[in-house]
């Protein structure tokens, strides 16, 4: 069996404990003195690495096709001059307003078949060709500009992949996925899903819809295959993001920050498209028996270690879930 590429194969040499966290200077660009004070405090705290640009799409591309990377380069330069490296993010984790306004198909549709309006964070369709195109474009631009920079240590792909979309594009993709899985044989679908129960047999693939309280949720095979499909779309989206970097000449290793046992992603499949596994650990202390919370977090570390059977990166953490929620809001 071929060994998956991992952190030891990609030339990532950590000659020190990589220590830091997310840094979002795009939120206060009008106050340049903050950067200098932040750098002073980072050095005092022995921070040597930050994740940069995770939610910066609106600043990187304020208008469609109009890119502004100068501020990012200045920040990377100043950090590097002070011994601070960067995990540079692709910004697909939160889209700009102009993208949703002009291309509403990028917004998710919930299980009740209602399309979301602009807002929140994970509110984008992984199937949407427009969203994939726009993400590919900005990823390639970022790779062309920054992959060669000595201060950029790795690529941080998006942020905490998760969630699902029930839009017409996803319904069509789901049916295509089912046709491939079941050799275009609707009778095989009925047999595997045991749809004869309650007389729920399908006559053709066009009748199949994703699980919804408005319709079907009782067929376990449908629910399970939908989860498999959503995981497939999420992993494929991440793979496409990384491919955009590679197509633009990017050679730096790529990771994405996983997050506990998200039910919509098979992390073993996600790990196959990553060079390095990383995850976000936010223990929810004081919400139950602390022994069990500690055991669960220990188990999560074990799971992350087994995904590639190599060292992993703890990308985010916090003293408690409440602090994390406050910092996010």
Task: Report the location of each language-model feature.
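Active-site clefts of carbohydrate-active enzymes
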Residues: 209-227, 281-282, 300-329
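Alpha-helical scaffolding within the catalytic cores
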Residues: 4-7, 33-40, 74, 141-142, ...
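Boundary/entry segment of secreted carbohydrate-active catalytic domains
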Residues: 9-31
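Short, solvent-exposed turn/loop segments enriched in Gly/Ser/Thr/Pro and often Arg
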Residues: 24-25, 51-56, 89-98, 153-162, ...
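Polysaccharide-binding and catalytic clefts of secreted carbohydrate-active enzymes
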Residues: 112-274, 280-296
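Short, well-ordered coil/turn segments that N-cap beta-strands
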Residues: 14-19, 46-48, 80-86, 148-153, ...
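Acidic-and-aromatic substrate-binding clefts and catalytic sites of carbohydrate-active enzymes
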Residues: 24-34, 58-70, 97, 163, ...
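Aromatic-lined substrate-binding rim segments of carbohydrate-active enzymes
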Residues: 35-116, 140-143, 235, 239-249
